[in-house]
């Protein structure tokens, strides 16, 4: 579909997204029904009758599985099983293998026991003693599939699960615990899955036009993966860059267009070496421990894109070669016809700094 995106003009981008990138609604409806069945089954069966008190407290979905940012064709998502009666992030780390084995056992049972609206396949890893687990829900007729990465997690936010306010004062104690354990264990960024609720809330009430822009970015990312066949930066880092662009454009009085936002996103990718982006939705500089840690984080090597729900995780990763490859593609794409106006001039980019300016230190 690269030729399709390259052959249109800027004013046609929104139509392209609606016509070619939206997933089939029938598939999404059936997918949600099957996800509900799988979640209920695992919550009921995992560790049923076990002597220890650990049970699945809830199941939370993450990633691109719903109507907001799912793509036509293939998407990736997460199913997070939160376990209660754990006391630390370290305990999650130590018992991960046990949890994955238990979940896999019941997923395989479920595959045999229940009918599904779409095709259900448990993915088995080729590596012995693997600690990863996934399953796929697909419809060959509709050429749609979603692969789910299944993750067990410490339910550190259980008491705050119904909190709808993005206020750091509610979460500072949790983040202080996270920072202490992560730095002690040298596992910074390894527990971001525990904050899946916050990842979802970060995106939940955004404008549909942002979701469509993210769809376009994910489509572009897939085209780059198919062409380059080399490791690329994490997709989530690009989604957060898209949010950063959108937030800036939303503050302006000028007319906001998909082409201008997309081209600005590509410009940020091209200048990745300067990226330092973070949000203060759930953590900020008012808590002493969290503030000290954030100041250290924000002085680290770039690109730096902090997970909005986990200050210990640099979503940009550390593979500079991957960023360099994608940056070159971004520079090429900035000259594409999909950024040309009717008079053949290029759509301008926003005057947007690759560094978030509101910083608590100098």
Curated annotation (Swiss-Prot):
Keyword Secreted among record annotations: no
Top-level taxon of origin: Eukaryota
Tissue note: Expressed at highest level in brain with lesser amounts in spleen, kidney, stomach, liver, intestine, ovary, skin and testis. Not detected in lung, thymus, heart and uterus.
Keyword field contains RNA-binding: yes
Keywords in alphabetical order: RNA-binding
GO molecular function, one term: double-stranded RNA binding
PROSITE patterns assigned to the protein according to its UniProt record, in alphabetical order: 25A_SYNTH_3 (PS50152)
Cross-referenced InterPro entries: 2-5-oligoAdlate_synth_1_dom2/C (IPR018952), NT_2-5OAS_ClassI-CCAase (IPR006116), NT_sf (IPR043519)
Stated induction or repression of this protein's expression: By interferon (IFN) and polyinosinic:polycytidylic acid (poly I:C).
Function: Does not have 2'-5'-OAS activity, but can bind double-stranded RNA.
PANTHER family in alphabetical order: 2'-5' OLIGOADENYLATE SYNTHETASE 1E-RELATED (PTHR11258:SF17), 2-5 OLIGOADENYLATE SYNTHETASE (PTHR11258)
Family: Belongs to the 2-5A synthase family.
Protein name (record): Inactive 2'-5' oligoadenylate synthetase 1C
Organism: Mus musculus (Mouse)
Organism phylogeny: Eukaryota, Metazoa, Chordata, Craniata, Vertebrata
């Amino acid at each position: 579909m690269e030729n399709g995106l390259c052959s249109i003009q800027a004013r046609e981008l929104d139509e392209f997204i609606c016509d070619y990138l939206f997933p089939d609604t029938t598939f999404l409806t059936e997918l949600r029904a099957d996800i509900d069945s799988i979640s209920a089954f695992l919550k009921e069966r995992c560790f049923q009758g076990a002597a220890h008190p650990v049970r699945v407290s809830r199941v939370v979905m993450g990633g691109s599985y719903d109507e907001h940012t799912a793509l036509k064709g293939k998407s990736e998502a997460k199913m997070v099983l939160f376990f209660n009666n754990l006391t630390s992030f370290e305990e999650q780390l130590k018992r991960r293998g046990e949890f994955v084995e238990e979940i896999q056992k019941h997923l395989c049972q479920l595959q045999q026991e229940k009918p599904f609206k779409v095709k259900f396949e448990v993915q088995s890893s080729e590596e012995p003693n693997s600690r990863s687990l996934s399953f796929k829900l697909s419809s060959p007729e509709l050429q749609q599939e979603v692969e789910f990465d299944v993750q067990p997690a410490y339910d550190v936010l259980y008491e705050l699960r119904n909190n709808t306010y993005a206020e750091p004062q509610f979460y500072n104690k949790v983040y202080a615990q996270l920072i202490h354990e992560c730095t002690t264990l040298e596992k910074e960024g390894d527990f971001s899955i525990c904050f899946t609720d916050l990842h979802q809330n970060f995106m939940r009430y955004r404008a549909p036009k942002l979701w469509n822009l993210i769809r376009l970015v994910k489509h572009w990312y897939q085209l780059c993966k198919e062409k380059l066949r080399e490791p690329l930066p994490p997709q989530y880092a690009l989604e957060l860059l898209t949010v950063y662009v959108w937030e800036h454009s939303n503050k302006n009085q000028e007319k906001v267009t998909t082409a201008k936002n997309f081209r600005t996103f590509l410009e940020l990718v091209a200048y990745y070496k300067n990226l330092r982006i973070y949000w203060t939705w759930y953590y900020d500089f008012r808590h002493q421990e969290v503030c000290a840690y954030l100041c250290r984080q924000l002085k680290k090597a770039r690109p730096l894109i902090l997970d909005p729900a986990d200050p210990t995780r640099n979503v940009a990763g550390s593979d500079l070669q991957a960023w360099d490859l994608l940056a070159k593609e971004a520079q090429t794409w900035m000259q594409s016809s999909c950024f040309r106006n009717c008079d053949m001039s290029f759509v301008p980019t926003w005057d947007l700094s690759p560094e978030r300016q509101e910083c608590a230190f100098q």
